[in-house]
Amino acid sequence: MPRPADTYTHDQGHLQNCPEYVAWRVAGNGQELAPTNPYNATGRRAFADSYGFDNSNLDLRPDQEVPTMQRIRSTLDMSKYFDEFFDDSLDHKCARVRCRSCGFVRAKNATRQADHLTQCKDFLATDEGEELMASGSLVHNVQQHQPPAIWNGARPHPDLMVRHLSNHPPSGTVPVGPCSRPEPSRASQRPEPPSLAQHLLDQSDDLLTNAVQHSFLAHAGSGSLSENDFNQWLAQIGYISRSLVPFTGALIGKIRIPETGNLEHDSTFRCLDLLCSAVTNMKKELEFLEATKREYGLEVGLDEPRPATKSFIDLFNSASCASATLLEGMVLLWAVEILFYNSFSYAGSFVAQPMPTQERSSFSLPSYSLPSSASPGAYSGQTIRKDRHTTALREAFIKNWKSENFSQFVDVCKSIVDELAMDQMTGNGRADTSACERVFNQAVWLWAQVFPQTTGIRTGHEDSSRDGGRENKAMNRNRSTGNSVEIEDEYNVQTSTQLE
């Protein structure tokens, strides 16, 4: 038999009293209705008693008030303060109201509408709003006392003893075990990932210190370096700087960018971004070297590359050949950059006072900009100073290669080395690590050989040259007095004695 017309609601009480439904059921259709819900306050108390719950300790004291809310629906006519409309949009499809005072729109709910009126500044500014607030029609009866402690966790169940991982156990509880266990720190929970770059620095600590603290750098910073030694070194640095350009280009040719949904977080793409910036930096650096020579009138001869310089160039070719990995090449590039920075930071520590000239650093992240080059005839018609190479060292070279911007560029190179090591090392990484150690150690050792032996040291004040014989004494005297002093190194002790 088909179901009768749905002219009634689905309320259980209506069905029980509906004659059409009774006749339909008598004909053998449908099934018995579920019994009415007996849940009420009396049933709840009976249920608690049947399971042994004792609610006697929850009785309120005589001085306590039951937290209640005034029946705003029966005392206030919300139609006076809200306009009702039906929202049939796709997202809502419900009855909504709009505040006549401020235009606030929300779903129809008398309690929430009353809550809005208590916070509506436009409504409270009216005379009617002030009257309702004064009469207490919009104020909830706030509970005067704190709820029982069992509801806020101050008195937990004695059978639920929780062991807190802290230095001090909760009050009223007995610590479990002989002593309380301290909470582990964030550092122990999140250990730092292994760093290949830091490993390379640690395993070559002594070798790196000897390379970046060469006696040539101490003389360069203190102002006692001869012009001949400076010109020899600058000529060799020119060969290394020019060789960096094809070396970096070969590394770019090794990059194969994969198909990925997040290209900017791919290590090979980030490496490509760094190498493109490095090529721009190298071009700027070559321009910087030539501009500084012209500006300070430096007479650098066309010396042939020395054996150490040739070995450095061969190392560039070896680390960028087809059999070498991209990681090896990036390790060598970072090694050269950090050798420049650490060396001239060491030389800068010997400068007595900071020069008042503007910083000449041409590095930025990731590339740098160079001030406009000086004209070739900057020294035309002027008397060339004898200490022009010392001035160029302090005002140009040292400031450029120990600047903060260059330091950040070196840090970026280091981070890329670690990213590539995490992504491209194969197996247990032992073979890749050994290859990187070999390249890094060769670069550090060759760097120390590029510096010429400081044989022609320019002397300063007579008294200063006689007082000190060792390098550390000269460092302290130079920093305290600011005078040009003679510094003897372990390679030229006899030569310095003859000069005195």
Swiss-Prot record:
Region (Disordered) location: 161-197, 457-500
Record's compositionally biased regions (Polar residues): 475-484
Localization in the cell: Nucleus
Positions with biased composition (Basic and acidic residues): 459-474
Domain of life: Eukaryota
Gene Ontology annotations for the cellular component aspect, listed alphabetically: nucleus
Transcription regulation in keyword set: yes
Keywords: DNA-binding, Nucleus, Transcription, Transcription regulation
GO molecular function: DNA binding
Functional note: The two putative transcription factors FPSE_09188 and FPSE_09189 could be responsible for orchestrating expression of the W493 A and B biosynthesis cluster genes. W493 A and B consist of six amino acid residues D-allo-thr, L-Ala, D-Ala, L-Gln, D-Tyr, and L-Val/L-Ile linked to a 3-hydroxy-4-methyltetradecanoic acid polyketide chain.
Protein name: Probable transcription factor FPSE_09189
